[in-house]
């Protein structure tokens, strides 16, 4: 998620995940970059152990509770479906809220798209290039980080519909070399409950990436960084946001789809969904036109232009590129199951606890207080793409920085402030330890606040002058 004005920085992130005792998050220090593919909505990195492989009772999230008729004295009335009408007054309030977060967080630029049955909102704020001052624009391409996981998950579910794999099959039946693979199912990988150690928290991986952001990684090399560590927990016992899970699922897609993962996702997901501005890159090149992305995930912690950093390190967990309009369309397609059989989509929407009240995780998506979808973060960029089913409404936003603001991903702060106005009974949550920006401080775009934690990635990493985990 990104921040607001000032020299901006953008590193794609996904879900904002608070600390958990079982999997401590690395501390982000000035001079220490923390890279981590994060997932959508704010969610705890792990939930407490439970008995059995899927001890928690799944909750089907297709029909969130309806909103009350109104959300405040003197405010526009929310319709029964949960969103307020996009009146001129509401639009003005949205403009003001977005400008406020932009200014307070130091995010360079943001694109925001809202679609409701009663109207649309599509606006850009700030700049796409801090050097030239080129304005941000909805037509620009940005990296989407962990939004990629929703595409990978959909590709796996398409294979389920084709009868090539079952969600409760052991991953060892399809992908060799996964530690404990006989006891880890495809479903547990998609639901972030494999218990494996995440490669993006391995010190050697982080040091390699931070010191050479154009390094080309293979999927097997990525997984090897995680496989050398013992499991964090038994399969199926706790939620832990983990990029390794989605690299393994990418290998599954290649094995059963018979094509490179990016090609299969393009043919089976992007093209059928009619997403003409969405792509799975094979190198660091950005399609034109694009927004420059800024990050502090560098050896010194200084903000750098990460636009053309090679995303091979994130692969099927976070490498993709899109526009805000395509994300609006995709959020609805993903949440309604337009590309899947109804029974398969129903399995996808069964969410389990994450440890964060109001937030559950299903198969490659979150339910954040009724909003279904994902968020993403990668060095230089952040995104959110979510859908509120009973309101048939979509929210998508993209930022060109991933620099944290007082420990929080800027994208979550934007989504939180926007939904306070748009859907006051369904407010996109951020981790309890985080708060909406109030005044510019040490955690602004000029650099992370000392001691701020990286959201969205689990364990570890030492040394004061080394990043602890890469955010995605």
Pin down the residues of each PLM region.
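Alpha-solenoid HEAT/Armadillo repeat architecture
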Residues: 103, 176-179, 254
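Secretory targeting and sorting signals
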Residues: 1-51, 58-61, 65
